[in-house]
C-alpha cells in the first residue's frame, strides 16, 4: 500500500483472511453479509476464513 496509514486493532472489522492447508493464502474484504472480495489469485478449493482480524 502506497501512502497508507497504520490502523488500530479492530478498526476495520470487514477484513477477511483466507487460509489453506499450507497456512495464509490471502486477504479480502467483506462487501456484504454473504460476499468477500479478494484478488483472482486467492482461488483455492479448500480454505477457511477468519473475519475481523
Swiss-Prot record:
One of its GO terms (cellular component) is secretory granule. PROSITE patterns: TRYPSIN_HIS. Inhibited by the small molecule serine protease inhibitors phenylmethylsulfonyl fluoride (PMSF) and benzamidine. The keyword Nuclease does not apply. Disulfide bonds join 26-42. It is an enzyme of class 3 (hydrolase). The active site is at 41 (charge relay system). Optimum pH is between 7-8 (at 40 degrees Celsius). GO terms for biological process: proteolysis. Expressed by the venom gland. InterPro entries: Peptidase_S1_PA (IPR009003), Peptidase_S1_PA_chymotrypsin (IPR043504), Trypsin_dom (IPR001254), TRYPSIN_HIS (IPR018114). N-glycosylated. Its EC number is 3.4.21.-. It is found in: Secreted. Keywords: Disulfide bond, Fibrinogenolytic toxin, Glycoprotein, Hemostasis impairing toxin, Hydrolase, Protease, Secreted, Serine protease, Toxin. Optimum temperature is between 40 and 55 degrees Celsius (at pH 7). Activity decreases at 60 degrees Celsius. PANTHER family: KALLIKREIN-1 (PTHR24271:SF47), KALLIKREIN-RELATED (PTHR24271). Snake venom serine protease that has fibrinogenolytic activity. Hydrolyzes the alpha-chain of fibrinogen (FGA), without affecting the beta- and the gamma-chains. Belongs to the peptidase S1 family. Snake venom subfamily. Monomer. This is Snake venom serine protease LmrSP-4. It comes from Lachesis muta rhombeata.
Amino acid at each position: 500500500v502506497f501512502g497508507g496509514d497504520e490502523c488500530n486493532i479492530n478498526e476495520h472489522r470487514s477484513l477477511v483472511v483466507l487460509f489453506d492447508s499450507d497456512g495464509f493464502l490471502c486477504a479480502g474484504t467483506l462487501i456484504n453479509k454473504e460476499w468477500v472480495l479478494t484478488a483472482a489469485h486467492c482461488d483455492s478449493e479448500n480454505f477457511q476464513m477468519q473475519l475481523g482480524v
